[in-house]
Amino acid sequence: MTTFDRGEKPDIGTLVAFDHVRFVVGNAKQAAYWYCANFGFEPFAYKGLETGSRITAQHAIKQDKIVFVFESALLPDNTELGEHLVQHGDGVKDVCFEVEDLDSIVAHAKAAGATIVRDITEESDENGSVRFATLRTYGETDHTLLERKKYKGAFLPGFKPHPMPPTFFHSLPRVGLNFLDHCVGNQPDLQMAPAVEWYENILKFHRFWSVDDSMIHTEYSALRSIVVTNFEETIKMPINEPASSNKKAVSQIQEFVDYYGGSGVQHIALNTTDIITAIEALRARGCEFLSIPSSYYDNLRQRLSVSSMKIKEDMDRLQKLHILVDFDENGYLLQIFSKPCQDRPTLFLEIIQRQNHQGFGAGNFKALFESIELEQTKRGNLFYENVKDGQHK
């Protein structure tokens, strides 16, 4: 595991934070409802036929500082969204960043050779105006750079308050997720380095953390990962690629690439200050999470017994909830991973709590991989020659 220094502050504008994540889905209304019911979000903004949007419908949901937007086509000839949906299934299309000094960021991106999906545009309504531009990153994933300034609306121009009353969601256990911690992108083999270089060259990100397959492997599969971040280290983007194994198994990273149809967002990590309460609430709502064997907790207790690090949370409750623990001499983190959020084994969510620990759970990768490999076995996907027929290698 390697960590990096942030270096000098770039001489372009500031990428402030994650603003929102936009999904392309088959039915935005149903997808938004599912994430609200399962993960504790509430609908707050809407754009569709009733608001004058004739092309797509968008449902925006939020939980504290986390905002997800689900978009689907309204007309049958929308080839842009239709082709994306056929190729990738429901998934993340755009990870939007709030920025300051949009002009200088876009000017640098153009000079560095970025693909500009949409040049600087201004949109306005009665609440003010916002300016934005959209860049293409890995695969068909985009980053919209959004400059809000003094916009006073609930979300963005063109959106109106969501028509669905949140009364039902208030009757469910409160979850308590606070902000988007990091957003992970999976790449085909040998495509991690070009993706990382894109962030370094186009957005002036720096490397924050990395591991390779000598550390992260099981009997069957392995991965390599590099985390890139902005200068302020408020936006963290881990980039993964599969690594081959002696067993010739299909890594979870390769499985994602095969079913997503290329590079894309594998998972979104959501931060909480009380993961035990959050997971108890999420399980009560019907969320499904990966199962961790009891042997993991036996080993964890043994390692903690000879460490100066003390975990404040009750270990029996962590084990009952299948929450993973990683620690070093400075602090620890607690994390858990959902099962895929759609039929394709692609996007899932992570819930994470940090106690003076800025890593990404390297000590848990082996247990996590083994748990995912059990799920791959159930799907018939741990060994296959061709993803379409599932025949074993």
Swiss-Prot record:
Protein's pathway: Amino-acid degradation; L-phenylalanine degradation; acetoacetate and fumarate from L-phenylalanine: step 3/6
Keywords: Dioxygenase, Iron, Metal-binding, Oxidoreductase, Phenylalanine catabolism, Repeat, Tyrosine catabolism
Annotated EC: 1.13.11.27
UniProt-listed SUPFAM superfamilies: Glyoxalase/Bleomycin resistance protein/Dihydroxybiphenyl dioxygenase (SSF54593)
Cofactor, how bound (note): Binds 1 Fe cation per subunit.
GO MF annotations, alphabetized: 4-hydroxyphenylpyruvate dioxygenase activity; metal ion binding
Residues involved in Fe cation binding: H182, H267, E350
NCBIfam families recorded: 4HPPD
This protein's name: 4-hydroxyphenylpyruvate dioxygenase
GN (gene name): hpd-1
